[in-house]
Amino acid sequence: MQELYLLGVVPSRRFEAVVNSLSKTLDGPKTILEFWVVYRPKDVPPNLPRQPDSWLRLCSNIESHDETDTEWSKNTQWSMYLEGNSEPKREDKCGIRPVNRAKLTNGSVTEFVEKMGYEFSHEYIIQGLEYFFFDTTVRIYQTLIPSQQRSIKPPFHPMNEEQPWILHVYTHVADASNQVAMAKAEANLTKVKTLLSAFCDLKNVRL
């Protein structure tokens, strides 16, 4: 599966104005509250870097979970993501990168990931809002740090005091060889970029 995307940065002082504009222009919003756990490959020789594109990420929607439940991570539905590097030399176009996603339903997620050859790296929480434009998703969010490891009990801490909001616009195409679908997806991203140009400069940032 291919993800076509654009990214932008919204200063905290402009958040409310941007959200008001998004709510008038797009369908939504839907609240985002997700817990992400990142794993890196084990046994990488010291002289070689652990490339982020080879890392594995687990995601769970924690909005409906009881924040006092210390066993939530064993009972929740996890999705697993493997994301590749975005294509180079597309500065004036949208970014494109391969994304593989699978739902994990049975057994210990941690044991499963470790048996695949990964070890824990770090974790974070994404909190924000999600909008929709045809087949395109528009997310505005902040990345937060939980107060304790694997805890969903607030407060969550921003990574810095002046942390901006990230505007992530994306769509997925199942088959990259389907040029009609790829062109349609890129056209929809261009429409969203034009719609949001008054308050955010969306760009292709290499991931």
Swiss-Prot record:
Major localisation: nucleus
InterPro entries registered for this protein in UniProt: Mediator_Med18 (IPR019095)
Keyword Cell wall biogenesis/degradation: no
GO MF annotation, one: transcription coactivator activity
Signal peptide: none
A Pfam family the protein falls into: Med18
Top-level lineage group: Eukaryota
Coiled-coil parts of chain: none
Any Gene Ontology biological process: positive regulation of transcription initiation by RNA polymerase II
Annotated compartments: Nucleus
Gene Ontology cellular component annotations, sorted alphabetically: core mediator complex; mediator complex; nucleus
Keywords: Activator, Nucleus, Transcription, Transcription regulation
Known role: Component of the Mediator complex, a coactivator involved in the regulated transcription of nearly all RNA polymerase II-dependent genes. Mediator functions as a bridge to convey information from gene-specific regulatory proteins to the basal RNA polymerase II transcription machinery. Mediator is recruited to promoters by direct interactions with regulatory proteins and serves as a scaffold for the assembly of a functional preinitiation complex with RNA polymerase II and the general transcription factors.
Subunit architecture: Component of the Mediator complex. Interacts with med17, prk1 and rbp1.
UniProt family annotation: Belongs to the Mediator complex subunit 18 family.
Descriptive protein name: Mediator of RNA polymerase II transcription subunit 18
Organism name: Schizosaccharomyces pombe (strain 972 / ATCC 24843)
